[in-house]
Amino acid sequence: MASSSLCHRYFNKITVTPFFNTKKLHHYSPRRISLRVNRRSFSISATMSSSTKKVLIPVAHGTEPFEAVVMIDVLRRGGADVTVASVENQVGVDACHGIKMVADTLLSDITDSVFDLIMLPGGLPGGETLKNCKPLEKMVKKQDTDGRLNAAICCAPALAFGTWGLLEGKKATCYPVFMEKLAACATAVESRVEIDGKIVTSRGPGTTMEFSVTLVEQLLGKEKAVEVSGPLVMRPNPGDEYTITELNQVSWSFEGTPQILVPIADGSEEMEAVAIIDVLKRAKANVVVAALGNSLEVVASRKVKLVADVLLDEAEKNSYDLIVLPGGLGGAEAFASSEKLVNMLKKQAESNKPYGAICASPALVFEPHGLLKGKKATAFPAMCSKLTDQSHIEHRVLVDGNLITSRGPGTSLEFALAIVEKFYGREKGLQLSKATLV
């Protein structure tokens, strides 16, 4: 078995060796992107099929939303035809941490369909529900028998794949607390991503992007994986302690529980939105997800359907300790054109209360409305030219007094952890970083 990064390898049938210089990635990202992936006994055809690859991602009540959304988003960025299927009796799913999603279809309606890849997210009780879903078990076993790809993350390798007998004689990884269970049915390893034959496994929320890009590579080839990974602004050293850059330090105060508003709109970046909501809810903040427009259901940038708690019209009636915007081009443009939201943000800034944004939103929302005046900020690399002050754009997470900004999907967990740190302290941020495997 050989360890290597996505950015520095090529494959033959058994071994893995470097395939190109990482400097070529600078077209996509100013930082080298690294995936810590272990692989054994697999092959990739020298010529990838040009036909669209079909991917199934089953979800259930209690599915880990960040894992599911990243998998969907990244595989769709790669050009795969991704079907999100609910194993419940309805397409609406109440994922972990109170995050609501809407699947594309019911699994019961597509059990005869054939997929190039089936990917299982984790989360509890969602992982148990997937394990107990007989139609899904049958599909995954047939997938294995037919020599097609199966993948699972978090608790799913141990709960589902292990229980179904797919891991006998295989190396696999999973969420740390399930390692003992995994060891009873596989050779358990602590890799962030593990490939053994046609089985790919990974550990948890913080490894999901690496896991997903690895599967883009398995399914669509290394060139497509590099193309997809660059704009994600992935961590250069995944697993290392997260860091933030802070200027003009001030305390972020709150009474009782932090009240946090997360607006979303059609075209919002789903990975960023869910990362912010997921991590802040883990920290026990009171997070209000508010939809712009007339519907609680929002279709995000990669067609993930998210359901807000309230409409912005309702959310406007309350005050917040923080207003924080996800990115996504369509979502940021909607935010910028919402007089109601812009007025809320201006009032927040004038009151010296925290506000923040990631990806396109600092450049498309904050900059044109004067919300970055006298402040240092960062944004999505391709949007940084729109910032008047570009002196600190290289930072992944930047805090300037009551303002916090960040770069893109691959910085979204760090961004959310930085918010936790500002409200609750460094120890709480590190605790959640460890729990999410950032």
Swiss-Prot record:
> What Gene3D superfamilies does the annotation carry?
3.40.50.880
**Single GO cellular component term:** chloroplast stroma
A GO molecular function assigned to this protein is:
glyoxalase III activity
Q: Where is the transit peptide?
A: 1-45
Tagged with keyword DNA-binding: no
Specify the PfpI endopeptidase domain's residue ranges. Answer: 53-220, 258-424
Q: Which compartments is it annotated to reside in?
A: Plastid, Chloroplast
Query: Which keywords does this Swiss-Prot/TrEMBL entry list?
Result: Chloroplast, Plastid, Repeat, Stress response, Transit peptide
Name the Pfam families on file: DJ-1_PfpI (PF01965)
Instruction: Give the highest taxon in the source lineage.
Output: Eukaryota
**PANTHER family (alphabetical):** PARKINSON DISEASE PROTEIN 7 HOMOLOG, PROTEIN/NUCLEIC ACID DEGLYCASE DJ-1-RELATED
Q: Its family?
A: Belongs to the peptidase C56 family.
> Function of this protein?
May be involved in oxidative stress response.
Describe, as the record does, how this protein assembles with itself and its partners: Homodimer.
Q: What is this protein called?
A: Protein DJ-1 homolog B
Instruction: Tell me which species this is from.
Output: Arabidopsis thaliana (Mouse-ear cress)
**Lineage of the species this protein comes from:** Eukaryota, Viridiplantae, Streptophyta, Embryophyta, Tracheophyta
Query: Gene that codes for this?
Result: DJ1B
